[in-house]
């Protein structure tokens, strides 16, 4: 079977020219040249979303126009009058199939236009790449896939009568008083076609290339042309075997050093016996070799251990245990400078304030018969008078006198109803005392007898009421509360760390007055001891070493 010979290209493909004679007898030659041919396009379809997903022909077609003037008898000597010629030009583009199709016997079904976008372009006079007129089509799209050509039709609107065609009728002058239809005419000059290009479907579209140099030159001169600086080509053919395996291996190799080269800061530590102590210390961060541990929280009757264990500093000067009264055992540490010990004691103060929801710890003020604990109570969230965890016995009371003072306490204190304190957890802990737990004997910290009320024994030694005591200018009023804890020598008082204006004010106090100035108090406050003489007086020692007394609260 004989093959069909290839179709010969049309005569007006890529470049075409035509000439005409004007009324003045001049020859005008029009020359069109498709400088940038369309190469590919993606079919946009005819659905509802076709206009939104429309892809223009790539690269955008560019057609150059040149106009020459010459003598009718001499075609050799031509003058380029493209910029000097006074006329309007526009180019209209249509879509044609590259292969002509035979007409069927039946009537063809009506179809909608296949070419969409902006098929009309006006002339733009540019200096580059050469001085000429250019028609640019940056927004042309094709709906269906196939092989097509673009056909460009040039139309001219003459402005001067001398440039009209030789056979054109002479226009009659318009009357000024009678309006008439505008008599402007468009003349078809010539047609040029592009080379065939392919329109692909969405699945077969190879992608877009970078913008050509001609598109960049035109865009630099102010024309509307889309510029792409990267290649958007789709990879065709079989997939390489290492396309995805390489990425997986690379990511796998990248994860291995991250996991094994750098040690994990939160890895499981070396197995060691756990301690139930509130402040268990890691052996790697201990302050001395084989520092003895303090008794655990269960031995002191605490219900919850501390959430974050911290290092426990050693006591500055632990008192040696006597035969009559045992004292708590403090951790043994090597001798260090006093400044370093004071720094550790100050840093350890913050470790004594966990969350204030620790019930079950009886207060010595409400339950005088509870078992003594060397730890401070955890009901105060921020107590400035808290010292180190192991506090020595009060120096004002001999240890041998404490057992005998238990019998001097005649009656229990009445329940407390009104407390002037800023911590709400103190009210709950003191209003509802919990019976003390049975303490388990321990070799590390033997229990001590409770500190009972000394109102009967020291009533003669303290005749003045609390209001007549010489107050310290830096003393902080705490309301009707009792603090049985002693101060360590390295503990800074609260007044050294906080200013005078930060003290809470009670009972009509003012920031510029003393804690309990006797001159500014009412007569009822001055004679409180006389009016309330039948109540018990409680004596306690403050953090700065001063002895003070308190009257039991009213029922």
From Swiss-Prot:
Residue ranges of the region described as Disordered: 1-23, 39-60, 234-533
Biased composition (Polar residues): 336-372, 380-389
Region (PEST): 439-479
Membrane-spanning intervals of the chain: none
Domain of life: Eukaryota
The keyword Cytoplasm is assigned to this record: yes
Knockout consequences: Reduces nearly twofold the length and width of the conidiophore stalk and vesicle.
Compartment(s) where it occurs, according to its Swiss-Prot or TrEMBL record: Nucleus; Cytoplasm
Residue ranges of coiled coil: none
Ranges for domain Velvet: 25-228
GO cellular component, one term: cytoplasm
Compositionally biased residues, Pro residues: 311-331
Motif Nuclear localization signal mapped to chain: 39-44
Keywords annotated in UniProt: Cytoplasm, Nucleus, Transcription, Transcription regulation
Keyword Nucleus: yes
Role: Component of the velvet transcription factor complex that controls sexual/asexual developmental ratio in response to light, promoting sexual development in the darkness while stimulating asexual sporulation under illumination. The velvet complex hat acts as a global regulator for secondary metabolite gene expression. Increases spore dispersing capacity by impacting conidiophore architecture.
Quaternary structure and partners: Component of the heterotrimeric velvet complex composed of laeA, veA and velB; VeA acting as a bridging protein between laeA and velB.
Protein family membership: Belongs to the velvet family. VeA subfamily.
Comment field on protein domains: The C-terminal PEST domain is a region rich in proline, glutamic acid, serine and threonine residues that is required for the light-dependent regulation of development and secondary metabolism.
Name of the protein this chain belongs to: Developmental and secondary metabolism regulator veA
Species of the source: Aspergillus niger (strain ATCC 1015 / CBS 113.46 / FGSC A1144 / LSHB Ac4 / NCTC 3858a / NRRL 328 / USDA 3528.7)
Classification of source organism: Eukaryota, Fungi, Dikarya, Ascomycota, Pezizomycotina
């Amino acid at each position: 079977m004989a093959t069909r010979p290839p179709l010969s290209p049309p005569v007006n493909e890529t470049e075409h020219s035509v000439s005409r004679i004007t009324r003045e007898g001049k020859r005008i030659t029009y020359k069109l040249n498709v400088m940038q041919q369309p190469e590919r396009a993606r079919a946009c379809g005819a659905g509802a979303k076709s206009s939104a997903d429309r892809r223009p022909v790539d690269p955008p077609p560019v057609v150059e126009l040149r106009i020459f003037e010459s003598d009718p008898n001499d075609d050799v000597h031509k003058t380029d009058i493209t910029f000097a010629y006074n006329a309007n030009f526009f180019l209209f583009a249509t879509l044609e199939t590259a292969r002509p199709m035979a007409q069927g016997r039946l009537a063809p079904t009506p179809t909608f236009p296949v070419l969409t976008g902006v098929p009309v372009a006006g002339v733009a006079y540019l200096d580059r790449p050469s001085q000429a007129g250019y028609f640019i089509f940056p927004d042309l799209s094709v709906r269906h896939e196939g092989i097509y050509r673009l056909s460009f039709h040039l139309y001219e609107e003459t402005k001067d009568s001398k440039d009209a065609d030789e056979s054109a009728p002479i226009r009659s002058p318009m009357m000024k008083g009678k309006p008439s239809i505008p008599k402007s005419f468009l003349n078809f000059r010539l047609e040029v076609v592009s080379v065939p290009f392919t329109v692909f479907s969405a699945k077969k579209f190879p992608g877009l290339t970078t913008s050509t140099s001609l598109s960049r030159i035109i865009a630099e001169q102010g024309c509307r042309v889309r510029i792409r600086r990267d290649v958007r080509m789709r990879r065709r053919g079989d997939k390489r075997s290492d396309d995805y395996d390489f990425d997986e291996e690379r990511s796998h190799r990248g994860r291995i050093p991250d996991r094994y080269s750098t040690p994990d800061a939160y890895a499981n530590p070396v197995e060691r016996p756990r301690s139930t102590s509130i402040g268990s210390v890691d052996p790697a961060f201990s302050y001395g070799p084989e520092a003895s541990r303090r008794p655990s929280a269960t031995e002191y009757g605490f219900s919850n251990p501390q959430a974050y264990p911290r290092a426990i500093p050693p006591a500055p000067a632990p008192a040696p245990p006597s035969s009559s009264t045992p004292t708590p055992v403090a951790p043994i540490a090597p001798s260090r400078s006093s400044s370093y010990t004071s720094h550790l004691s100050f840093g350890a103060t913050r470790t004594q304030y966990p969350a204030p929801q620790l019930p079950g710890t009886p207060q010595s003020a409400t339950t005088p018969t509870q078992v003594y604990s060397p730890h401070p109570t955890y009901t105060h969230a921020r107590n400035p008078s808290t010292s180190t965890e192991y506090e020595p016995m009060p120096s004002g009371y001999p240890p041998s006198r404490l057992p005998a003072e238990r019998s001097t306490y005649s009656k229990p204190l009445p329940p407390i109803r009104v407390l002037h304190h800023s911590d709400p957890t103190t009210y709950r802990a003191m209003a509802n005392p919990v019976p003390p737990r049975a303490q388990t004997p321990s070799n590390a910290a033997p229990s001590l007898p409770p500190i009972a009320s000394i109102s009967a024994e020291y009533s003669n030694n303290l005749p003045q009421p609390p209001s007549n005591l010489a107050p310290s200018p830096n003393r902080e009023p705490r309301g009707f509360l009792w603090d049985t804890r002693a101060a360590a020598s390295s503990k800074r008082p609260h007044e050294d760390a906080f200013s005078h204006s930060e003290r809470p004010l009670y009972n009509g106090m003012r920031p510029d007055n003393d804690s309990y100035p006797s001159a500014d108090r009412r007569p009822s406050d001055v004679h409180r001891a006389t009016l309330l003489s039948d109540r018990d007086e409680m004596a306690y020692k403050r953090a700065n070493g001063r002895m003070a007394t308190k009257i039991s609260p009213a029922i």
